[in-house]
Amino acid sequence: MSRKNYVFTSESVSEGHPDKLCDRISDAVLDAFIAEEPEARVAAETFATTNRVVIGGEVGLSDKDKLHDYMDRIEAIARACIKDIGYEQDKFHHATCQVTNLLHEQSAHIAQGVDAAKGKDEGAGDQGIMFGYASNETPELMPAPIHYAHAVLRRLAEVRKDGTEPTLRPDAKSQLSVRYEDGKPVGVTSVVLSTQHADESQTSDDIRAIVEPYIREVLPDGWITGDTEWWVNPTGTFVIGGPDGDAGLTGRKIIVDTYGGAAPHGGGAFSGKDPTKVDRSAAYVARYLAKNVVAAGLANKCTIQLSYAIGVSKPLSIYCDTFGTGEVDEEEIERAIGKVMDLTPRGIREHLHLNKPIYERTAAYGHFGRAPDADGGFSWEKTDLADVLKAAL
């Protein structure tokens, strides 16, 4: 964006939103197979509706007997996810909903394009374009609207799960309109929060009284003023929620998962996909590169685009845009990236250590802007490439 003064809005959804529940199950299935075999091939999709969960897709393990054994564990994995999220309502309960497993072995025709062979490196799992973005407007180098929209829902989930606010239920959405002055976020012009709750007698005002202190707690001081508009459960009662209220599907919240609309998106979803799928791994490394460009002080904001062809190992293109904030030309940054980073699927996986069971935790509250974990989770949020990039210029 070239404008300096404007209002920009992003939304988030909770871990109990039907689509996010499906993302969680798909990534939990992925983690289970990767824990057994780090180079397992997985494309797991989940559908959820009233009293029913259906899991389908493709899985590949080198040991076919283990593959069949693991199929028997899928139902328990799904139920554990539903239980942890907190669904115990009449028409969607972790113990009583029907779980159907339709996973099957990966197509040999897909595998032949991806698998490494003599004289041929591992190819990309599909064609596509992937984007990464970073901005210095928050310490996490994320756009402020999506960062704080996630923070609101994460805090409400905490107080719901620890029993502090027992009337809150899992399904929720947030939306923040953030005012920018001179290109920096300075306040919130409107707050939208819809959350499922237990009691039909509770009004919108009752729910606002519960959630407002937590929303104020996670937003920077001074961002909420007397002019801030509040829309809490604006339709009134929200007792029927989760998959009983709206069907859920894996991969339907790709803007929530990334930058809240503040950056382009290539269209590919993440959850349920192993790291040979560049929809996921290349989007992660694009974020890693953009974040390190900004962390290195080379720009205040940065977009990176990568493109791939199925079965081809190296990216077809590398694109950088610093929106006029760069300390060096974008072409120099592109060349430096090509020098210091192996952007083949294998190179990405090895550099970011992606062949680990680290994906279930990514399914809610954004894949980006999270703190790297000691076990390798969110490795794409590290800034260990910043000095290397500067040295390559």
Swiss-Prot record:
Pfam families: S-AdoMet_synt_C (PF02773), S-AdoMet_synt_M (PF02772), S-AdoMet_synt_N (PF00438). Residues 106-116 are annotated as: Flexible loop. L-methionine binds at E58, Q106, D246, K277. One of its GO terms (cellular component) is cytoplasm. Keywords: ATP-binding, Cytoplasm, Magnesium, Metal-binding, Nucleotide-binding, One-carbon metabolism, Potassium, Transferase. PROSITE patterns: ADOMET_SYNTHASE_1, ADOMET_SYNTHASE_2. GO terms for biological process: one-carbon metabolic process; S-adenosylmethionine biosynthetic process. Pathway: Amino-acid biosynthesis; S-adenosyl-L-methionine biosynthesis; S-adenosyl-L-methionine from L-methionine: step 1/1. Mg(2+) binds at D19. It comes from Roseobacter denitrificans (strain ATCC 33942 / OCh 114). Catalyzes the formation of S-adenosylmethionine (AdoMet) from methionine and ATP. The overall synthetic reaction is composed of two sequential steps, AdoMet formation and the subsequent tripolyphosphate hydrolysis which occurs prior to release of AdoMet from the enzyme. It is found in: Cytoplasm. HAMAP family: S_AdoMet_synth1. Belongs to the AdoMet synthase family. It is an enzyme of class 2 (transferase). GO terms for molecular function: ATP binding; magnesium ion binding; methionine adenosyltransferase activity. This is S-adenosylmethionine synthase. Homotetramer; dimer of dimers. It catalyses: L-methionine + ATP + H2O = S-adenosyl-L-methionine + phosphate + diphosphate. ATP binds at H17, D171, A172, K173, D246, R252, K253, A269, K273. Its cofactor is Mg(2+); K(+). K(+) binds at E45.
